[in-house]
């Protein structure tokens, strides 16, 4: 067992996919701060988005990007002016067990999977404190992340 595996064994975590967002631009997806021990994440499966986090420069996200918030910080994903209202969002029936939401935006399509990692709050403090407020992994064109790219393609179906 390597060092990282031993470290992660000390901090058991769970993960869950919460919702699939299939939006046409313009859209604004705001997420409030999560509770202790909850780290939300988003996988950009198709299209693009902008990420706004208070006190941080805005980031451009594209298909293949994974963004994680180890401290559960509030953030906004959007493809428009983040201060404007987006096209109304509503839930649709889906063949999958995953909740799916869409909007009536008629612009470029962005497909996002949203989920969260959860740890016991008192156990996770030491590990998560060492991480920045936002982690971005760009898988597009990264040969060493081929397994992660394959997983994202599988989840897209």
Residue ranges of predicted features:
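Amphipathic alpha-helical segments enriched in hydrophobic/aromatic residues interleaved with Lys/Arg
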Residues: 101-157
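Short hydrophobic-aromatic micro-motifs
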Residues: 67-70, 112-114
């Amino acid at each position: 067992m390597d060092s990282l595996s031993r470290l992660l064994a000390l901090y058991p975590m769970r993960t869950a996919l919460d919702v699939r967002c299939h939006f046409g631009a313009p859209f604004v997806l705001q997420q409030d701060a999560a509770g202790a021990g909850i780290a939300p994440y988003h996988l950009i499966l198709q299209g693009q988005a902008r990420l706004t986090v208070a006190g941080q420069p805005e980031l451009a996200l594209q298909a293949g990007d994974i963004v994680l918030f180890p401290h559960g910080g509030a953030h906004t994903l959007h493809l428009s002016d983040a201060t404007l209202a987006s096209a109304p969002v509503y839930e649709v029936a889906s063949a999958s067990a995953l909740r799916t939401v869409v909007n009536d935006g008629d612009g470029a399509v962005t497909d996002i999977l949203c989920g969260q990692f959860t740890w016991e709050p008192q156990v996770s403090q030491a590990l998560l404190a060492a991480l920045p407020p936002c982690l971005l992994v760009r898988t597009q064109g990264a040969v060493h992340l081929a397994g992660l790219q394959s997983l994202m393609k599988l989840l897209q179906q």
